[in-house]
From Swiss-Prot:
One of its GO terms (cellular component) is cytosol. Mn(2+) 2 binds at D305, H310, H358. The gene is deoB. GO terms for biological process: 2-deoxyribose 1-phosphate catabolic process; 5-phosphoribose 1-diphosphate biosynthetic process; metabolic compound salvage; nucleotide metabolic process. This is Phosphopentomutase. It comes from the Bacteria.
Length: 406
């Protein structure tokens, strides 16, 4: 029986979304702009990386052709390989959003057909009645922030006041999200998670997709830094996903990284926690060794988005891509006959774009494994085709939204 390994390179978009203008993202292209900056020397950083973007393994899996089909151009400064291995294409998101749950749920065969709730960008972000209920039910004297903000910026700006007053820092972004930053020692991690659970219950009526706990440590604005104890409190997907269907048919779903949180821990057999792309790859490789016939290993590589995309760090994003590319050889060595690897993304987060938010883009679709014939699958109409292809590979019935490319 077959196994499947689904890797989401969080935010690794390839541009070209036909509805990007509706999201203020016309022209956004995460891969294309990173390559362009690197080719021009703007992706160099002493001691980290220099020169054109170099992704030889991903290129041999069709990344150059994917970029051209999605955005109409090859990435600058990157050689085109003589031969491509495996299946390659791009996918267009049909969900109404450019957020993490929408992208992942659609990848798993369940597009989001409803509109998320969002908070206003002008004035106070949160309704007064929400803040009053949250402070009352969670037992705090008030909150700080109450605005749209970058997570690292608001910690630097309000972290010392948070320590002094004991008030959690609450903020949002262009996503359907309520984020809470608090000091792990002065406020306490358990207290932060309990606060977020209260917020999750109150925010359902506002149709907010996620509450995110953002713990940090440090003593002053110059030393504050986030820890690896982030946790997402998501609403449930609107209908059964690929993960639920696999469980229903007696298979195992191994969720590596934040996958469990994204799916509200539904359709998960086993959670494997790890922080940072390198540790996530280590955990994924170990899980591949342990996976049985019929299993799915599902990993989100979060650093591309959280550490580099939102912070608009081109050299950091480029270096992370190159490090991931180098480790694909370790994945190749572990594959057995019948295995399928799928590489994709959930949205874009162009590090050259204005602001700090996600960008609406198409995503790459790469599928390979022993016996997989190389071919182009063009531009798919929905991310859901990915989930349906995995369903077919693992021998379970098709779902209602996507079409398999296998």
């Amino acid at each position: 029986m077959a196994r499947a390994f689904l890797f989401v390179l969080d935010s690794f978009g390839v541009g070209g979304a036909p509805d990007a203008a509706a999201y203020g993202d016309e022209g956004a292209d995460t891969l294309g702009h990173i390559a362009e900056f690197c080719a021009a020397g703007a992706g160099d950083r002493a001691g980290l990386r220099d020169g054109p973007l170099s992704l030889p393994n991903l290129s041999e899996l069709g990344l150059m052709q994917i970029a051209r089909s999605a955005s109409g151009r090859f990435p600058a400064g990157m050689p085109i390989p003589e031969k491509v291995y495996g299946i390659y294409g791009a996918a267009t998101e049909i969900s109404r959003g450019k957020d993490t749950p929408s992208g992942h749920w659609e990848i798993a065969g369940t597009p989001v057909s409803f509109d998320w709730g969002y908070f206003p960008t002008e004035g106070d972000a949160f309704p007064e009645e929400l803040i009053e209920a949250l402070c009352r039910d969670a037992g705090v004297s008030g909150i700080l922030g109450n605005c749209h903000a970058s997570g690292t910026e608001i910690i630097a700006r309000l972290g010392e006041e948070h320590i002094r007053t004991g008030k959690p820092i609450c903020y949002t972004s262009s996503d359907s999200v309520f984020q809470v930053a608090a000091h792990e020692v002065h406020f306490g991690l358990d207290r932060l998670l309990a606060f977020c659970q209260v917020a999750r219950g109150l925010l359902d009526r506002y149709n907010i997709g996620r509450v995110i706990a953002r713990p940090f440590i440090g003593h002053s604005s110059s030393t504050f830094q986030r820890t690896g104890n982030r946790r997402d409190f998501s609403v449930l997907p609107p209908e059964p996903t690929l993960l639920d269907r696999l469980i229903e048919h007696g298979r195992h779903v191994h969720a590596v990284g934040k996958i469990g949180d994204i799916f509200a821990h539904q359709g998960i057999s086993r959670l494997i926690k790890a922080n940072g792309n390198e540790a996530l790859m280590d955990a994924t490789l170990a899980t591949i060794d342990e996976a049985e016939d019929g299993d799915l290993v599902f990993t989100n590589f979060v650093d591309f988005d959280m550490v580099y995309g939102h912070r608009r760090d081109v050299p950091g994003y480029a270096a992370a891509l190159e490090a991931f590319d180098a480790r694909l050889a370790e994945v190749h060595k572990k594959l057995k006959p019948g295995d399928l690897v799928v590489l994709t993304a959930d949205h874009g987060c162009d590090p050259t774009w204005r602001g700090t938010d996600h960008t609406r883009e198409r995503v790459p679709v790469i599928a390979y494994g022993p016996g997989i014939r190389s071919r182009s699958i063009g531009v798919r109409r929905s991310y859901a085709d990915i989930g349906e292809s995995i369903a077919r590979h693992l021998g379970i019935p098709a779902g209602p939204h996507g079409r398999s490319f296998l």
